[in-house]
Amino acid sequence: MIDQYKHQQLRIGSVSPQQISAWATKILPNGEIVGEVTKPYTFHYKTNKPEKDGLFCERIFGPIKSGICTCGNYRVIGDKKDEPKFCEQCGVEFVDSRIRRYQMGYIKLACPVTHVWYLKRLPSYIANLLDKPLKELEGLVYCDFSFARPVVKKPTFLRLRGLFEYEIQSWKYSIPLFFATHGFDTFRNREISSGAGAIREQLVDLDLRIVIDSSLVEWKELGEERSTHNENEWEDRKVGRRKNFLVRRMELAKHFIRTNIEPEWMVLCLLPVLPPELRPIIQIDGGKLMSSDINELYRRVIYRNNTLIDLLTTSRSTPGELVMCQEKLVQEAVDTLLDNGIRGQPMKDGHNKVYKSFSDIIEGKEGRFRETLLGKRVDYSGRSVIVVGPSLSLHRCGLPREIAIELFQTFLIRSLIRKHFASNIGVAKSKIREKEPIVWEILQEVMRGHPILLNRAPTLHRLGIQAFQPILVEGRAICLHPLVCKGFNADFDGDQMAIHVPLSLEAQAEARLLMFSHTNLLSPAIGDPIAVPTQDMLIGLYILTSGNRRGICANRYNRSNWKNSKNEKIRDKKYMKKKEPFFSNSYDAIGAFRQKKINFDSPFWLRWRLDKCIMSSREAPIEVHYESLGTYHDIYEHYLVIRSIKKQICCIYIRTTIGHISFYREIEEAIQGFCRGYSYGI
């Protein structure tokens, strides 16, 4: 069992048979060692009690009811009297029943079994370490081939080398005539190895440091060969693939050395049995039992393993082919338990439903890790859909009233009592239920000094969870500034976010100093800005500044305008005859827009200050309009200049839209605010 106070992380990897035995084995007070599951039974059909040495045995996994053994005797847990701590009749310890959530058992396999994750998953770790094709290793594991066992400093009678098919050997029927049955088995086992045992022998003989050195030497030789012979493209690709394989092989060997994992641990001799509470049998209405699929897969393994034990021990005259066939069945049963369907057709029950194996239980969105460990429900948390909050600051978020009053209810009750708005907790809760006006005022004060954390799954990097200062908003959706969406990889098409309230002072300080959104503007991976306009903001800016498609030359022949005007609406034809209005300042233009005298994208002329005008002296006017008083207008593509008789500039008008004005004013206010903040800092 993992101590939650001592261990804050979890590492998954291969373990030795000794470690599996240490997890599952326990010594009873009378000195008896228990832990091995030898029977494929669960509960007795008459007594409804767990079978001894079965998958739910109370001697191995602990009592079903705290302090009560199989016989029905009772002892107080934690009692310091000299009474025995276990039942001498049934051998069950008087301990808490919660032990059945973490106490494991084991199955002692009659033959070594290859772990299918390391053999069949890509890349195959066993094939990479042994530098052999995966098909050859599969044929060896599933007894399609046999392997000649090298006998050091001893002559071999059959003179076999490498892999061979046992079925087609000429000596298969002739040599047994000269041996007794037991003698031939000893002779055959001396020179022939098959199944996962052959894989294990090769992994035991493997020296990882020699693997690294030999792979490095071959990698260098291939590099020199590729530099000298670079004419054949096919050979270059072949050499490149081999070099990539050697790099993966060296990295894998270094990983095994660094983590102190032995390669032979990828072949199982002991099979762990999960605690019973993780694979329960539940009785439903009508007396029917519902069992976890893992129990049926365990039973299949135990049945086949016990059959193999009988063939190896009780029957001395068992043919070798029958033993190899039974070893293959044990291997397939363990494969189904670990990963059902990895070798093709999955195993199904009587209702044609596929059994759920270990892989199905732990992987995916509904697996043990993502649903139970990473996605478990916690207190002081909520969840809702996100919507855009265009008026929010970067470090703020809008929290719905309904969610806020639940998350901050504890703090709200304390503030109501402290400020004498409520005499006790009951009165405070009644005020909160009635949603009196004073409640919202106190809630705003509480939230003002308390940050919250927003998280969007999957949390693939540290910007997947950020801190914000909450403010109350109407509705039921979380309002979010659009600039922070890239860090969350979120958009406003129905995405949901989780809300967490940091409780301790340390958590609140960490949220304020390290996790606020306005302090996380750069990507932690590459250092590029991550708070940049995306999606909704880009579309909004485009619509804001797009304007009318017709330019100032709309009344003249222009090829681009002629192409764009094919699908113009009737209102655009009316626009050609309508004169564009003039405004002396932006306030008048915005007032006309609010009075619906002009449209959002309708162009107009806006008087501009001379000190803010930048004109190109080489640009020629498109048209020149002369007035009766001698003044004239130089009309350019985007601005208009009114000059006097002496050619002096009287005033300047720019051709713009309401969207451009709004965008310019926002940028101007932002720059002025930045300059003021910078001057205050100096």
UniProtKB/Swiss-Prot annotation:
One of its GO terms (molecular function) is zinc ion binding. Its EC number is 2.7.7.6. Zn(2+) binds at residues 69, 71, 87, 90. Its main location: plastid. Transmembrane segments: none annotated. Its cofactor is Mg(2+); Zn(2+). One of its GO terms (biological process) is DNA-templated transcription. Keywords: Chloroplast, DNA-directed RNA polymerase, Magnesium, Metal-binding, Nucleotidyltransferase, Plastid, Transcription, Transferase, Zinc. This is DNA-directed RNA polymerase subunit beta'. It comes from Lotus japonicus (Lotus corniculatus var. japonicus). The gene is rpoC1.
